[in-house]
Amino acid sequence: MKQIINPLKGNNNKVPIWFMRQAGRYLPEYKKVRETTKNFLDFCYDVSKATEVTLQPIKRYGFDAAIIFSDILVLPHALGWEVDFKENIGPILKQFKSQEDFKYLQINPNYKLEKVYEIIKKVKKELPSPISLIGFAGSPWTVMSYMLEGKGKQDFKTSKKFIYENKILAEELLNFITEKTADHLINQAKSGADVLKLFDSWSGVLAEEEFTEFVIEPTKKIILKVKEVFPKTPIIAFPKGAGLLYEKFIKEVPIDVLAVDQMVPLEKMKEWSDKVIVQGNLDPVVLLTNKEIIKEKTYKILQVMKGKNFIFNLGHGILPETPTENVEFLTEYVRLYEEKNSNSTF
């Protein structure tokens, strides 16, 4: 049985473990491969190299899932939108400002997305059979925010002002991205992805009304469309920073797994795990500390979530400066907890 899917099958004795950004800059073997290609998007579309770095953390740590090496912005890029990655700056995009800008978006994605699907097929062939393969996409609001802001990690005034002042146009853009995101996830499942994930990194900047319109509704549409084709493929949703709106999200979105950030109280995770599988939520900064702190913080999570529908992960991605030995220690500690804590104290 696929290890990451165990909780979905009612097997909650084993705690599946994988990490967001588990293939990335903290790994020396990743850096070595990454240095061979200057342009980040070219690297994402390189079948051989993306396959190699997807498998690196599996070979090193033996996680229960591999997540395909890609980026949430490959979708708008493949749809013709201008996207670039600047070193030490991050993504830079053409800004979407008016109805006229739809002319830069293609109805059908170009060949670039086919590269992503080739990578999934290649990884699938090389991945040990018990390990799940996760495909993913950015959620519509987050992708739309990048397009409206022209860059990432802003205060989102531009995006929010746009959706307040341009309701019809904002809805049109949202619907376009929603449709293409669903298609992208379906194609990933067709290519061999066992599990799918939606990353909504900027959902936490919205008030309740806009959260419902731009996060909950498009996520529901995507999941329902994917499930029409792949009813048994588990879907993880991560509305990062949703706070109190996580509960509204759980009630209204038919997800299999809810990923949560480190700000969510453990007792809430425990409560929610009666309704949905919960994934999270160790603070990534804990991995920058020492073994005693890692052990202490991890133990608290494992104890609260003991016997619950739970996947161990971080509250966000692994930080680039994370020591590899700390990731190894954490992974081994979770495994040891599983072994020793079935019927005894630990």
UniProtKB/Swiss-Prot annotation:
Q: Where does the chain bind substrate?
A: 21-25, 40, 71, 146, 201, 316
Q: Does the keyword Lipoprotein apply?
A: no
Record localization:
Cytoplasm
UniProt-annotated site: Transition state stabilizer, residues:
71
- What's a Pfam family in this record? URO-D
EC number, as in UniProt: 4.1.1.37
Q: Catalytic activity, per the record?
A: uroporphyrinogen III + 4 H(+) = coproporphyrinogen III + 4 CO2
- SUPFAM superfamilies given in the database record: UROD/MetE-like
Q: Which InterPro entries match?
A: UROD/MetE-like_sf (IPR038071), Uroporphyrinogen_deCO2ase_HemE (IPR006361), Uroporphyrinogen_deCOase (IPR000257)
Main subcellular localisation: cytoplasm
GO terms of molecular function:
uroporphyrinogen decarboxylase activity
Gene Ontology cellular component list: cytosol
**EC top class, as a word:** lyase
Family membership, please give it: Belongs to the uroporphyrinogen decarboxylase family.
> What is the annotated quaternary arrangement, including any partners?
Homodimer.
Q: What is this protein identified as?
A: Uroporphyrinogen decarboxylase
